[in-house]
UniProtKB/Swiss-Prot annotation:
Location within or outside the cell: Cytoplasm
Taxonomic lineage: Bacteria, Bacillati, Bacillota, Bacilli, Bacillales
SUPFAM superfamilies in UniProt: C-terminal effector domain of the bipartite response regulators, CheY-like
PROSITE patterns reported in the protein's UniProt record: HTH_LUXR_1, HTH_LUXR_2, RESPONSE_REGULATORY
Protein name: Oxygen regulatory protein NreC
DNA-binding segment(s): 172-191
Post-translational modification: Phosphorylated by NreB.
Residue numbers bearing the 4-aspartylphosphate modification: 53
Length: 217
């Protein structure tokens, strides 16, 4: 199987490439350092599996890239690699189309197993996360009480890209340059974000981003 690894740390890309290339049925054909590059590498190689870090440079996080890649290249299975053992992250990536979720501190054998699992089309969840997943379903009554305040359901993909950048202090021009859009487009999205989330000021937006853990994306 062909594999692409996307992580902003070179040591992670190199280390995981060595582990996977040692397997007879696996070949790491390329690596990427951010979400934009990950999309380009998937388009170039059409890999069977993309292993992608959830938190990469702002503007194109693993979560945003996952949604775009799933939409454009549905045959590529995405395994999210992360240090966050938080069910919120888990549910967000699964909703966006990822097939697996594994922690960075997982043993080598577990990584190999995870890759093979998603390659087969099955879903892989790090064993440390299964308890959280079960508890969530047990407590779920069929109606998500927080859905009206869930940014991943309220905001568009572009708005989810822009919100963390605003909260981190980037100006409209800087955001426009990062996302290759006009300043007017950024301003319009900012207005829509504030309206959709019922926020009145930038401090409220920053507080919201922190509470929803959006600054990690």
């Amino acid at each position: 199987m062909k594999i692409v690894i996307a992580d902003d740390h070179a040591v992670v890309r190199t280390g995981f490439s060595m582990i996977l290339n040692f397997q007879d049925d696996m070949e790491v054909v390329d690596t990427a350092a951010d979400g934009v590059e990950a999309y380009q590498k998937v388009m170039q190689h059409q890999p069977d599996v993309l292993i992608m870090d959830l938190s990469m440079p702002p503007g194109e996080s693993g979560l945003i890239a996952t949604s775009k890649i799933v939409e454009s290249f549905p045959d590529t299975k995405i395994l999210i690699l992360t240090m966050y053992d938080d069910e919120e992250y888990l549910f967000h990536v699964l909703r966006n189309g990822a097939k697996g979720y594994i922690l960075k501190n997982a043993p080598d054998e577990q990584l190999i197993s995870a890759v093979r699992t998603v390659y087969r089309g099955d879903t892989y969840i790090d064993p440390k996360m299964t308890t959280s997943l079960v508890n969530e379903f047990v407590n779920n009554t069929g109606q998500d009480a927080n859905s009206t305040n869930d940014p991943f359901r309220i905001l568009s993909k572009r708005e989810l890209e822009i919100l963390p950048l605003i909260a981190k202090g980037y100006g409209n021009k800087e955001i426009a340059e990062k996302l290759f859009v006009s300043v007017k487009t950024v301003e319009a999205h900012k207005t829509h974000i504030m309206q959709k989330l019922n926020l009145k000021s930038k401090p409220e937006l920053v507080e919201y981003a922190l509470k929803k853990k959006l600054l990690d994306f």
